[in-house]
């Protein structure tokens, strides 16, 4: 007789194959229809006091999403959901950075030469259209990743009210005396024709000249030094800046020597100079650097005076100890010359070409002006080397790390121009500087990983004043009026507040569209004819750094609280958004805009190399979704240590898919074997059920603690190990007999099912933030015992901890089972047995014999566990001097359960016989 139909076999409609790529979009559509999921998450937590606000760092509204975008938004989604499922009120308003050079450049590429014929208003409208287009594209792409957010009400930095809030933040900083316009060298992108902030500069390898040039000291200076002739030898890597040389800097505290040949070097670097054959090394005179102050040298290019000055920035780690100083082309140069009231000369225009300043200031001889004016600086190096003649002691090329514009990818220069700066060291904030207060406030912020605080603090400690002005069209204007005559900037409250109102209504375009008289408040005391507009725009980092003000600190968005619970971005944002947000918030409100900062690394290929189209190693999130499913991308994030760079490739995604398959199969087994449970036991568990509940509690608590610290890969590693080693590897296997063969309401069967239900509930709650799709799907197929009152995943609540606590000394259990199956592998290989059910396990272990022997037999998956007798053994082993003996069962195989417990061949064992008889009663 075939007893298969008499068994309670597992049954579930939850599919084994996930078919993610096809089915995910359908479920996502349901989540996003009428903003269902996000609105439900808000509604479910109405009246809850504990909240979590993750403030979204805005990506650029330009281009399609790459894998880094996916990593960032999915990680945010997981963390927000983790707090939601813990019972907190959560808010996540996504946003976009809509201004700035990347968008303007894309518009220029489309326009080509037509740009010259367009007004600023027309250019700005085209930029707005471009940004709007990519906001919609990226929003759809983010939604296709299953990220839950307030997609119907995102924040856009180009909205009228938003531009007004950005400008309002600028005005607040100006009123505190922290804003200053001055001429100073700043990073300048000649390719973009604009100033850059530090955060907009990236470093790449660049080949440059390394040259040593001798400047003859004038006769009066030589006389003061008591020598017939002397030459100050400088080293530079920027020959093109030599026409603008105004000084030569020396370290006041270092010793300098004049060699027999008349060359001046730092004594500490003399050996290097000998190695270069500049000198034989014979010293004519030795002096301190301070003794050279205010002497004069002659620039060999133009015969202009170059003053010898002192500066602490002169180091002894290379060169000659004498530094070519052009105050228009370097920050150290600028500050050194400032002390001596030396003029800042800037002979380079905004496109990187020499201009008429060469003629006006006599920076090159008359006969060379036609050749150099209009020449790009980087094309001038070789010609300048020729013109130096004998003054050029050495010229060579070398490769070094050099600043490049982050958007044009062209090398930048230092160029002195009139710019607007937020001052870092003016003590205007309750007697403290912005630098001091920002560093002080950072102490209240928790960083993940902890090393982030040192990184951000170091950047704040060492950063210069923040250059916030840009010479472009697409951005929020630095909308100030200047008196034409006095050049004084008007910081009048009535004027500034009136402009805020205009921007709220009409947007910042009004600054270009309206005449001055229409921008002033009614009955203004200022005569519009005496005023002119400042036409610079704000650095986009000021835009994004003000988002806390416009989004969290205004009533315009239901976006959560200021200060935000968390800012979460890539590690590059220490120098970008984290820093700009900190400075603006501290300047205005004397506190940080965030309580926690979490950073993640960058995505690289499986070899750790940066992704690029040329290498063919780019992984697109759209392709991952199409080929594997978004759930695989989410699981990849959970399994990766995101505090460092994250490796991703097809091979890695295949491995993640295999892990997902195991998780899904475990869920399926739990659903299939609890489909008919009607009563959940919470107290009277069998030994094996207590054991799995104990192991579950340990794993769940470690996992939960790791998740609380956002150490997802650590937590997931423990969770997956529990699922594969304990739950699937042991427990679910050993439970099959009682689940399939015992009576439906048998206490042992109900005990096992109940343990599975309790584990499934907690497992689903732990997985819901990361594998939201899978858990939502699983709940549709789950018995009410598992899902309780949940209609979908957004009804779940993850209660802290796991209340089912049991203490079982399982060391002997584990060790003996491992050894037993090690021996069984050999017995099966040698074809001595086909199944462990053919066996009895004999032991002298009281620890095992004192328990329910049916349970212990299930633990080893044998038919009987008993005391050791004289029966012949197939194998023997010892664990901690406790004997175990494997013998063939003396009973017969039960045709229903296959255990060797039947007294006669072909007959049912007592258990199966009882179950079948009960059905017929």
UniProtKB/Swiss-Prot annotation:
Motif ('KMSKS' region): 610-614
Motif 'HIGH' region, residue numbers: 59-69
GO biological processes: isoleucyl-tRNA aminoacylation
Reactions listed under catalytic activity: tRNA(Ile) + L-isoleucine + ATP = L-isoleucyl-tRNA(Ile) + AMP + diphosphate
Localization per Swiss-Prot or TrEMBL: Cytoplasm
Binding-site residues for ATP, renumbered to this chain: 613
Cofactor: Zn(2+)
Binding site for Zn(2+): 894, 897, 909, 912
Record carries keyword Transmembrane helix: no
Cofactor note: Binds 1 zinc ion per subunit.
Domain free text: IleRS has two distinct active sites: one for aminoacylation and one for editing. The misactivated valine is translocated from the active site to the editing site, which sterically excludes the correctly activated isoleucine. The single editing site contains two valyl binding pockets, one specific for each substrate (Val-AMP or Val-tRNA(Ile)).
Role summary: Catalyzes the attachment of isoleucine to tRNA(Ile). As IleRS can inadvertently accommodate and process structurally similar amino acids such as valine, to avoid such errors it has two additional distinct tRNA(Ile)-dependent editing activities. One activity is designated as 'pretransfer' editing and involves the hydrolysis of activated Val-AMP. The other activity is designated 'posttransfer' editing and involves deacylation of mischarged Val-tRNA(Ile).
NCBIfam families recorded: ileS
Record text on subunit structure and interactions: Monomer.
Recorded family membership: Belongs to the class-I aminoacyl-tRNA synthetase family. IleS type 1 subfamily.
UniProt-recorded name of the protein: Isoleucine--tRNA ligase
Gene name, Swiss-Prot/TrEMBL: ileS
């Amino acid at each position: 007789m075939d007893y298969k139909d008499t068994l309670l076999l597992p049954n579930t409609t939850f599919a084994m194959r996930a078919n993610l790529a096809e089915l995910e979009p359908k479920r996502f559509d349901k989540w996003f229809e009428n903003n269902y999921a996000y609105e439900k998450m808000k509604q479910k937590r109405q009246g809850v006091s504990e909240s979590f606000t993750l403030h979204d760092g805005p990506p650029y509204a330009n281009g399609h999403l790459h894998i880094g975008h996916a990593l960032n938004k999915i990680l945010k989604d997981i963390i927000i959901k983790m707090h939601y499922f813990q019972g907190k009120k959560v808010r996540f308003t996504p946003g976009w950075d809509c201004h700035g050079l990347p968008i303007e450049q894309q518009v220029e590429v489309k326009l080509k030469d037509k740009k010259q014929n367009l007004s600023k208003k027309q250019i700005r409208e085209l930029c707005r259209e471009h940004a709007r287009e990519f906001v919609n594209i990226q929003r759809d792409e983010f939604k296709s990743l299953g990220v839950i957010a307030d997609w119907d009400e995102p924040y856009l930095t180009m909205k009228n009210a938003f531009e007004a809030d950005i400008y309002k933040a600028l005005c607040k900083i100006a009123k505190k005396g922290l804003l200053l316009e001055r001429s100073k060298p700043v990073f300048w992108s000649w390719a973009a024709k604009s100033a850059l902030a530090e955060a907009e500069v990236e470093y790449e390898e660049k080949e440059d000249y390394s040259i040593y040039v001798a400047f003859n000291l004038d006769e009066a200076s030589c006389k003061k030094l008591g020598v017939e002739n002397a030459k100050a030898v400088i080293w530079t890597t920027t020959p093109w800046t030599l026409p603008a040389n105004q000084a030569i800097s020396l370290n006041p505290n270092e010793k300098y020597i004049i060699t027999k040949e008349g060359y001046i070097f730092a004594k500490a670097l003399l050996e290097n100079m000998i190695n270069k054959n500049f000198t034989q090394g014979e010293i004519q005179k030795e002096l301190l650097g301070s003794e050279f102050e205010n002497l004069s040298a002659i620039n060999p290019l133009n015969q202009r005076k170059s003053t010898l000055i002192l500066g602490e920035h002169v180091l002894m780690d290379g060169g000659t100890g004498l530094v070519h100083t052009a105050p228009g082309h370097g920050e150290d140069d600028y500050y050194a010359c400032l002390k001596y009231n030396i003029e800042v000369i800037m002979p380079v225009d905004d496109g990187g070409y020499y201009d008429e300043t060469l003629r006006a200031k006599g920076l090159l001889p008359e006969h060379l002006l036609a050749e150099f004016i209009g020449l790009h600086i980087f094309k001038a190096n070789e010609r300048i080397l020729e013109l130096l003649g004998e003054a050029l002691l050495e010229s060579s090329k070398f490769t070094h790390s050099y600043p490049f514009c982050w958007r044009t990818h062209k090398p930048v220069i230092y160029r002195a121009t009139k710019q607007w700066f937020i001052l870092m060291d003016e003590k205007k904030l309750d007697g403290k500087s912005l630098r001091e207060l920002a560093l002080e406030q950072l102490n209240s912020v928790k960083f993940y990983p902890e090393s982030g605080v040192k990184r951000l603090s170091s950047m704040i400690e060492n950063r210069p004043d923040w250059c916030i002005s840009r010479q472009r069209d697409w951005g929020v204007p630095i909308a100030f009026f200047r008196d034409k005559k006095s050049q004084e900037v008007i910081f009048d409250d009535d004027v500034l507040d009136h402009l805020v109102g205009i921007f709220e209504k009409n947007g910042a375009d009004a600054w270009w569209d309206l005449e001055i008289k229409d921008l002033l408040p009614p009955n203004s005391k200022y005569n519009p004819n005496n005023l002119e507009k400042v036409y610079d725009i704000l650095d986009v980092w000021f835009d994004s750094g003000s988002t806390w003000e416009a989004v969290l600190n205004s009533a315009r968005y239901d976006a959560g609280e200021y200060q935000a619970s968390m800012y979460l971005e890539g590690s590059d944002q220490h120098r970008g958004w984290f820093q700009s947000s900190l400075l603006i918030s501290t300047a205005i409100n004397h506190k940080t805009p965030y309580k926690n900062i979490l950073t993640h690394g960058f995505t690289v290929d499986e070899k750790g190399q940066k992704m690029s189209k040329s290498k063919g190693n780019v992984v697109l999130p759209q392709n991952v979704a199409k080929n594997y499913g978004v759930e695989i991308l989410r699981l990849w994030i959970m399994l990766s240590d995101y505090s460092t760079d994250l490796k991703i490739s097809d091979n890695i995604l295949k491995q993640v898919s295999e892990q997902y398959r195991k998780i899904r199969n475990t869920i399926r087994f739990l659903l299939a074997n609890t489909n008919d449970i009607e009563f959940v036991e919470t107290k009277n568990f069998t030994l094996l059920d207590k054991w799995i509940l104990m192991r579950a509690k340990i794993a769940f608590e470690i996992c939960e603690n790791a998740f609380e610290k956002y150490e997802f890969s650590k937590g997931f590693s423990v969770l997956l190990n529990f699922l594969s080693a304990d739950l699937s590897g042991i427990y679910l296997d050993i439970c099959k007999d009682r689940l399939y063969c015992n009576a439906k309401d048998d206490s042992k069967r109900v005990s096992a099912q109940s343990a599975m239900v309790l584990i499934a509930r907690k497992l689903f709650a732990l997985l819901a933030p990361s594998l939201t799709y899978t858990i939502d799907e699983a709940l549709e197929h789950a018995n009410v015992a598992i899902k309780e009152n949940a209609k979908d995943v957004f009804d779940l609540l993850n209660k802290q901890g796991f209340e089912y606590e049991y203490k079982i000394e399982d060391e002997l259990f584990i060790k003996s089972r491992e050894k037993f199956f090690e021996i069984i592998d050999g017995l099966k290989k040698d074809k001595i047995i086909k199944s462990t059910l053919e066996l009895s396990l004999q032991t002298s272990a009281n620890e095992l014999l004192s328990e329910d022997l049916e349970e212990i037999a299930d633990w080893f998956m044998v038919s009987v566990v008993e005391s050791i007798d004289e029966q012949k053994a197939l194998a023997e082993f010892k664990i901690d001097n406790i004997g175990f003996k494997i013998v063939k069962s003396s009973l017969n195989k039960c045709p229903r359960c296959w255990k060797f417990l039947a007294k006669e061949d072909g007959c049912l064992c007592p258990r199966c016989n009882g179950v079948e008889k009960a059905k017929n009663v």
